[in-house]
Amino acid sequence: MDPSALDMAIQHALAGLYPPFEATAPTVLGQVFRLLDSDFRGDGLSFLLDFLIPAKRLCEQVREAACALYTHCLFLHEGWPLCLRDEVVVHLAPLNPLLLRQGDFYLQVESWEEQSVHMTLKCLSSDLREVDKKPIPESSYSLIFTPEWLEAINNDFEGRPLHNCLVASENGITPVPWTKITSPEFVDDRPPIVKVPSSDGDSCPLEDLHLSRPQEPYQAGDLGGKGSVAQIWDKGKGKLSGDKYPGLIKVEPARSGQLAFRTDSEASQSLEGDYVALLGFPQEYRGASPDSEVVTLSVDIQKSQETRPRTKGAPLLGKTLPLSGPAGAPPLGRWACERPAGSGEKPCSGGSRRKARHKASGHTAVRQPQQPHTSVPEKLPDCTSGLVEDTEEEPAASEMQKPVGMPEAMVRLRPGPRQAFSPLLSSAGPGSPAAETKTEETTLGHGRASKPEDCLNKNASFHGSPAPGLQFSFLKEQRVPHVTPEKALLQHARPRKALCPLYSLQPCEAKAPGKDGTTLPTTSGSGPLSGEPPGFRRDSAGPPGGGLRLEECSRTKPRIETLGVKLLQSGIACLPGGRDKVGRPLLLVSTAEDAWEAPWCTTSEVAELLSYLCSVPRLEDKAKGLLVVIDARKGTQRPGLVSALQGIQALAPASVSKVLLLGEKASIPQLSVLPAQVEVLTSLKALRNHVDPSQLPEALEGPFPYHHSEWVQFFQKLDPFLTDLRQASSLLQASIQEFEKGEPPGGVQEATRCLSKSKELMETVLRDPGLLALQREGGTTLASLQQEASGLNANPDVRSHLTEAAALYNLVDGQLHDLVTASNQLLRRLELRVRLGHLETAIHQVSDWMAGEGSQSLQALAPVHVCAETVEKVHAEFEDFFLQVAAQYRQGLDLSKQAAQLGAAEEGAGEMGLPDLAAFASTQQAFQARLTHFYMAAERQRTDLETLLHLHRFRRKMSRFHMDCQNLLTQLSLGKAVKASPGDQLHLRLHCYLKRLASEFQTEKLLAMKLQVASLSRPGLGQEVWEEAQERHQEIQSLLRKALAYCPCPEVPATQVALIDRSRPVAKGQGLPREVGSKWDRSLQDSLAVDHVFKSQRTPQGEQSRNMWAGLLSPEPGQSGDTEEVRGTPKLPDPTLERLLASLFSWPHLPKQSKASRPTGGSFSSEGTGSQTSLEDSPHTSPPASL
């Protein structure tokens, strides 16, 4: 999503809640940023959809309820009660709790449920230690900003009563008495109104603006010089029509030399008068020098006292306002309009649209709806915007720039196949007799659309020179047919107000000349809410009295936008609202009006007007047909009237039930050709036989209230509003059906494509210009219509259409929420499918590795009956392979964790019943079982290799010790003639070997070695190594026994004897004889003496020690003997010692261990002769059976 468009949408929503936004923006945006970081993790789109849109609805509801108590008043602070100028009353984020004191509280809008918010009251708890949060029930929203509401809160509150409300501004947090907040200030509190005579002789009330310069009367002819700005007050009603939407227009600082107007409610723009409410000027605007730039706003009241009997209008009078504001860029959300170079007018900027007229011969002002970054090259600037109204003006330029963030190519959803087009109109210059219209055509689905720059270059600019920065808003989907100024498509864009849109884009509006010389707004049909059906054209005015061509009436229901403004207001035909005695609507046609002679009053135009009037009544009334009353009492013949009636009856035979001619039949002789029943009435008394007198309007001398100008203005605003609502409803309904179709079949790619398409569809719908306009200003338009309908309550047609508008508005509002819900559900399911697909792909990758490369490596590196060197090589390779196994295992565990989290999240969202999720759950369980089994197999194989490697090392160590013992025995046998003395080298070597036998090769290590062999996964693996080690151990015992036989006094230290004794199993109750123990005690003392002598003979450098071991490893020189003498065994001096040695070298026969036995511990020697490796440190156990 475009970040700039998202920012624009958020700022637009905040600006509507907290006007003036340039004053409240620092505070409000600070709260928004805190809320984004704390609750939405910086996700602006979720903040907009889940919080800001519901919060905007709630705040508007509270504001409307609060303002409804003060009707007929104009609020000084337009943001009341949500804010007071720059002080924010209703907060979006929590305040610092340390700022709360007893009696203080503040109001905050908080998230409640999914895409729902509620308002809470926060204050200190009774113990003053924490912040107490009190949700405000929805039923109390209409009473919040009243003193009674706080009294009710205090009655239920324990502790000190609440009386101060915390408000936030750029200067900090300030407590304000609640009574001050609930008592709004009004513009009525001002000096008396000054009346200044106007050029028409009427008087106009003028506010005293407290400016430094005296007031100057306005000169009606001075259009280009210094003008005036003032507040015009409605004399008839004594108020501006803005019951529900206060703060109609305010003055805000603009760039240097400009004055910016802005409206936050358009309810005051009823057609009974044109008003500009000028509120308090900032201090910097007062007392400026006369040379400062000025802003001129001219308003002309078109209707006279006779046309508007209930409103006394007057031209705008005022004075020049000097501007001395600081230079700088306008605040966010402000729409600026600038004068092109050489236009001779001062620039102005405005944030609302309002009609501005001025009567002048040969030249009229043009109303230009403001767009973002729109230059308005007109003589008179329109500094305000609001409800768009039809005006009587000359055609003029309407040039717009492409809205920010609009993509070059955008596909719009449409309820049905249609095309939309919009002419781009441009002014040819001040001297041209008529506006020259140039159009650019683009193709929908074929060819290439023209760029906005091309459109700018190809369109004429004001005064022959382009305005700086002037561009058109040109959408690629538009298809613009060739339209002449006389046949320009008449479309009408209406302001709307509702939820904040996703994209703050506006429909492109332009001026098209009407057939009667007036100017009507045209809306580019770039979206599905385009007002005009495709291919619709209306011919220009034909000759008066000409025949009616039926093909001109062959289109669908006529629209009021297609009718000429002068024809509507002429009064030649009207629907006063009365009913005859049968209940048929009364259609009054007057032949006495001078408009029949006008060139724009053609037969086709009259037929179109009558056709439209026949479509206005309610459906049940139209079924009865209309009663047409032709007032021809003055006897004027109108032959075109009969042709018009024939035309509408040819298209809709049941539209006219009966025709009553009030006057002489000779006045309209062709009535007999009409298919409907025709009756001639010569007097009003005869008319009362058909229509009750109370249902007759004033034109037929009846009391029924009817004001034609008000009726026309009401339907000019209502009909386009209804059209836009119907088209928006169709658009939303089609979108909802599209989202409710369900997920398409297919894999991850199809789900990804559908996900992207759904997001684009949702984005396109929410960016639709018509829907955006309804969201922005629909509520305001509806409120304005309700206000204007108060004077037409007697007309049932007005009541029924207003009820339909309210119902359609609520329907669109509900459909918008349904669309968001359906979109969220579909997007959630599609995102789930995509995530599941990615997880399944990753799981398959791990599974394929285990089934392929992993299994092959396990088989290739399996332990076999090989030599020690091969085992060491295989073990090293397997260690590298096991690193890959561990990495795959960790990845598999991470995937399983993600799957579990995804399942838990969907279970919390109620999506556990989805078939994709159920199938993935079974896949994930099978994968986890395979992963565990594979990892356990690798662990077991790694353990087997390590055990086998340790067995080979232990066997090799024992073989080396066996060779040492053989060497010792050989040396002893060679020197048997000379008996070894207790202190010679051979004796010491024997002493060391006996010590090693007792420590390094004891019985427990041999038993542990046997258990390790039994623990291997393959039967018979390592058995040969074990048997060889056992054989070497027995041979070592035999060799050492023979070596002891050559020693005259083989004394062994008592400590070594104890170790050897503990190393072999001793039968229960068996022990050494007492005399033997005493002998070994003496031997221990001799051994210690020998050790002392041995240690004293060693040199510090170790040189003598190395020579001694060299002698021990080689036989003594001169030592020799016969083989027989070697084989002979010398007699031991003591039989007790012989029994002890026999017990020392006796080998316990170990039972064979079963294959299922597992080692429990022990230690054996590793490589070398001095180091030991604990068996408990080796991985002889397997991983758990399950994860």
UniProtKB/Swiss-Prot annotation:
Residues 302-405, 419-451, 511-551, 1095-1134, 1148-1187 are annotated as: Disordered. Residues 352-361 have a biased composition (Basic residues). Coiled coil: none annotated. Residues 321-333, 422-435, 517-534, 1160-1174 have a biased composition (Low complexity). Residues 1096-1107 have a biased composition (Polar residues). It comes from the Eukaryota. This is Uncharacterized protein KIAA1755 homolog. The lineage of its organism: Eukaryota, Metazoa, Chordata, Craniata, Vertebrata.
